[in-house]
């Protein structure tokens, strides 16, 4: 048999026991670290060459290889890369490498076995939930007609689902159903929670039980819908009809306002801004009954938009004003809002009708709502929401002008104020038309337009007719701006 070939060793430096990937890199390392002259920094190839260089050039004797580990500083050994290394050192190197490889393999196998054992232990010791043991003293649940029994809750009283971890069980002697609830909703009730010594049944979904005066939910209704309005003549269910049960601290019944039989109670709307838009204001004969029903109604969800407008019965004219001759009665004693700064006390509009055309009547502005504060120096005043600040400012006396009504012709030229076209207000006429263009005097630039009876230049045309189409300069030449004198025209047409 042939001799077994020795395994080629990885390049390594005999002087410092450092491994390298390539022998060329090893040679460069030896020239830079071990065979370099410390005087002239010349890189030599072997240890004996370094010693000869230092003796001949620098007249110095070197007896050890620089940067070498102890025991391998022999300067007489001629080592170039992997060549020249003693055989015993090569064998020792092989033995150390084999020992290192065996140790690494053993460690790797041990790590793999540990991971496998950990996986097996984790799989074997899986989490098993403990079964819920039924409490003593309870009877098995009875099946309700039309509803399947609750699965996974043996030994629990009827109407209670299985308790979650960390929730205390029910106290004995406590009824599972609220008084006044229908029997079909037993399984929709959750456990009780104790607040300040009072036990309150909490329905599923986080809803509070119905308060006094509100009927309970019917079977099949979603929880978000409002309760049905009872018919006239049937009083709603109140707190007095609830049956007191032993073991529960009953709250005292809240005082409810007396609601007359023919008037249905006003329920809280889902959208108060849209709910009160269609709330009609009745006549003065039923104002007292409305005040009682409004005082018994609940507060609105959004007080900023609630009570913003109140619709008035009767037809509406062309100028969006009511045509009824008698003013509508306003509601008295409205419910106190939560935020009085965003609401108004009362707002009513009165109008008068005319046989030919409806004239805009002056709206009766109510007293601005004030917010009473604790400080004596601050006082907030909020104006009417129906009238803007510009309209309120336009009603001041200095902005009022008096114009003759359509159908009345002024006699002679009206007086002209210091500013052209602006007349001072007269106390005889109502100050309701604030911003109108100035009307030229009658007869100054011509009379009435042909074919348009009753039309005055500069005034409002009759209803249903537009202003007459007058070509330029037919109704009169354009006026110069105020403060400028018109130029004098000569006969030739030049200045």
Curated annotation (Swiss-Prot):
Residues 127-136 have a biased composition (Polar residues). Residues 112-121 have a biased composition (Acidic residues). Residues 283-292, 326-372 have a biased composition (Low complexity). Residues 99-111 have a biased composition (Basic and acidic residues). It is found in: Nucleus; Chromosome, Centromere, Kinetochore; Cytoplasm, Cytoskeleton, Spindle. A zinc finger (C2H2-type) spans 11-34, 35-58. In day-13 embryo, strongly expressed in the nervous system (brain, spinal cord and dorsal root ganglia), with strong to weak expression in other regions. Continues to be strongly expressed in the neonatal brain while expression is weak in the brain and spinal cord of adult. It comes from Mus musculus (Mouse). SMART domains: ZnF_C2H2. Residues 142-161, 464-484 have a biased composition (Pro residues). Its main location: nucleus. Interacts (via GLEBS region) with BUB3. Residues 1-92 are annotated as: Microtubule-binding region. Residues 99-161, 252-292, 316-372, 462-495 are annotated as: Disordered. Kinetochore- and microtubule-binding protein that plays a key role in spindle assembly. ZNF207/BuGZ is mainly composed of disordered low-complexity regions and undergoes phase transition or coacervation to form temperature-dependent liquid droplets. Coacervation promotes microtubule bundling and concentrates tubulin, promoting microtubule polymerization and assembly of spindle and spindle matrix by concentrating its building blocks. Also acts as a regulator of mitotic chromosome alignment by mediating the stability and kinetochore loading of BUB3. Residues 376-408 are annotated as: GLEBS. One of its GO terms (biological process) is attachment of spindle microtubules to kinetochore. GO terms for molecular function: heparin binding; microtubule binding; zinc ion binding. GO terms for cellular component: cytoplasm; kinetochore; microtubule; nucleolus; nucleoplasm; nucleus; spindle; spindle matrix. This is BUB3-interacting and GLEBS motif-containing protein ZNF207. The keyword Nucleotide-binding does not apply. Mainly composed of disordered low-complexity regions outside of the C2H2-type zinc fingers. Coacervation depends on hydrophobic and aromatic Phe and Tyr in the disordered low-complexity region, that may promote coacervation by forming intermolecular hydrophobic interactions. The GLEBS region mediates interaction with BUB3. The lineage of its organism: Eukaryota, Metazoa, Chordata, Craniata, Vertebrata. Keywords: Cell cycle, Cell division, Centromere, Chromosome, Chromosome partition, Cytoplasm, Cytoskeleton, Kinetochore, Metal-binding, Microtubule, Mitosis, Nucleus, Repeat, Zinc, Zinc-finger.
